[in-house]
Amino acid sequence: MPKGCLVITVSGLAGSGTTTLCRKLAEHYGFKHVYAGLIFRQMAKERGMTLEEFQKYAELHPEIDREVDRRQIEAAKECNVVIEGRLAGWMVKNADLKIWLDAPIRVRAERVARREGITVEEAFMKIAEREMQNRKRYLNLYGIDINDLSIYDLIIDTSKWSPDGVFAIVKAAIDHLDPVGDAGSKKEKEVG
């Protein structure tokens, strides 16, 4: 692993494996794990709302998203932190490594169904509705198209590997990371 202060963001849609990966990274490297989804869920619980109710509430109250984002940006000032959230890669502009995890919606629905003890069909509908709401909200609030993956350094389809396989890929990326500058760029010589 490169020496120094690393800030890594891990983003992805529901059921893509972001939390699993972040837990493994935090455990292996001793990184602090900042989880935007947990912040959001805690805020819903504080207001006595389900996640779905709070999602709709947040659409009308942009201060909710801004508070979650503020906490992520604040966390990025620390060293050796992995920040998990759908917009983490967008919010933490100077992250050393920005990762996006993806998987087909059917695979993600199966994972969410197992995790939440609901049917795959229920999970599919919840995910589809939530993603539509989030996409609209992020576009209106920040002008961010969540489907634009151009800002990410590493994009992984987690349906192709086990959680340990995904971790191995990311570990290799971290262990060979050149956080100073752009390892692949051709620097122009200064002309004087």
Swiss-Prot record:
MF-aspect GO terms: ATP binding; CMP kinase activity; dCMP kinase activity
Record keywords: ATP-binding, Cytoplasm, Kinase, Nucleotide-binding, Transferase
Database matches in Gene3D superfamilies: P-loop containing nucleotide triphosphate hydrolases
Entry protein name: Cytidylate kinase
Family according to the record: Belongs to the cytidylate kinase family. Type 2 subfamily.
EC number, UniProt record: 2.7.4.25
Positions contributing to ATP binding: 12-20
Enzyme superclass (EC): transferase
Location of this chain's protein in the cell: Cytoplasm
One GO term (biological process): pyrimidine nucleotide metabolic process
GO CC aspect terms: cytoplasm
Source organism per UniProt: Pyrococcus furiosus (strain ATCC 43587 / DSM 3638 / JCM 8422 / Vc1)
Reactions it catalyzes: CMP + ATP = CDP + ADP; dCMP + ATP = dCDP + ADP
Alphabetical list of Pfam families matching this protein: Cytidylate_kin2
InterPro entries: Cyt_kin_arch, Cytidylate_kinase_dom, P-loop_NTPase
